[in-house]
A protein has these predicted regions:
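Secretory-pathway ectodomains
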Residues: 11-17, 37, 54
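Short basic helix-loop element that most often maps to the first helix and adjoining turn
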Residues: 15-34
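Helix-turn-helix DNA-binding elements, focusing on the entry/boundary residues of the two helices
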Residues: 28, 39, 54-57
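Short glycine/serine/threonine/alanine-rich loop segments
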Residues: 26, 37, 66
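Residues in the helix-turn-helix
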Residues: 30, 41, 70
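Recognition helix of helix-turn-helix/homeodomain-like DNA-binding domains
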Residues: 36-52
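Short, charged recognition helix plus adjacent turn
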Residues: 1-10, 19, 24-25, 44, ...
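DNA major-groove recognition helix of helix-turn-helix/homeodomain DNA-binding modules
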Residues: 55-70
């Protein structure tokens, strides 16, 4: 990844946890209980003010029975050949 791309990505939402929770009619509180995490942590992940670890993303995907890729927002214009 080029440095200029990092600056652009830093300003965008990197995960779709909140969207996927809504699609599955689940709440932050439910996810916090499932993961044994503080509700404030889940809230930060859902608002993209903090990002979960890869391990946490995998656990979230398992709880929601989705592919982990559904929880990640990919930049639309990123050139994968660079």
């Amino acid at each position: 990844m080029h440095p200029q791309n990092y600056d652009i990505m830093a300003e965008k939402d990197l995960n779709r946890i909140k969207v996927v929770l809504v699609e599955h009619k689940r709440t932050n509180k439910w996810l916090a209980e499932q993961l044994g995490r503080d509700q404030a942590t889940i809230s930060k992940w859902c608002t993209n003010s903090a990002q979960p670890s890869l391990e946490a993303l995998i656990q979230i995907a398992q709880c929601l029975k989705v592919d982990v890729k559904e929880l990640i927002r990919f930049p639309e214009n990123e050139n994968q050949n660079d």
